[in-house]
Amino acid sequence: MKYQQLENLESGWKWKYLVKKHREGELITRYIEASAAQEAVDELLSLENEPVLVNGWIDKHMNPELVNRMKQTIRARRKRHFNAEHQHTRKKSIDLEFIVWQRLAGLAQRRGKTLSETIVQLIEDAENKEKYANKMSSLKQDLQALLGKE
């Protein structure tokens, strides 16, 4: 395992995940009966400040269909949490106008790359074009100097 699991912190993330899903209208409990489901949700809401008990609630009441999705969410959150500790692994964000994002996303999709890889490739292409233009300009000046000496 690359990233250390921190039980209290991750239990808090799980609690927030489940509450968010409940507020979005998803069924977070394994119960079909509305009163049993609401009872379990009320119990979950009361556990906000007791992260260790959240795991017990999950084992007892959580909808099995949410298990893998929650694991993926927590894994991604753990990765972001630990990557944020170091400048070189910390994610940066930029604001793009929608049309710019749309064109960039289309280009990335056509190239089969991520947005970040596409941006790096575009920067490298621009740098190479600039180097080529400078080299051609230098060759042109040298050629003119040679022809001018005759």
Curated annotation (Swiss-Prot):
Keywords: Cell cycle, Cell division, Cytoplasm, DNA-binding
Pfam hit, one: MatP
MF terms in GO: sequence-specific DNA binding
Cell compartment(s), UniProt: Cytoplasm
GO cellular component, as recorded: cytoplasm
InterPro entries named among the record's database cross-references: Arc_rbn_hlx_hlx (IPR013321), MatP (IPR009390), MatP_C (IPR035375), MatP_N (IPR035087), MatP_N_sf (IPR038339)
GO biological process: cell division; regulation of DNA-templated transcription
Known role: Required for spatial organization of the terminus region of the chromosome (Ter macrodomain) during the cell cycle. Prevents early segregation of duplicated Ter macrodomains during cell division. Binds specifically to matS, which is a 13 bp signature motif repeated within the Ter macrodomain.
Family of this protein: Belongs to the MatP family.
Assembly with partners or alone: Homodimer.
Protein known as: Macrodomain Ter protein
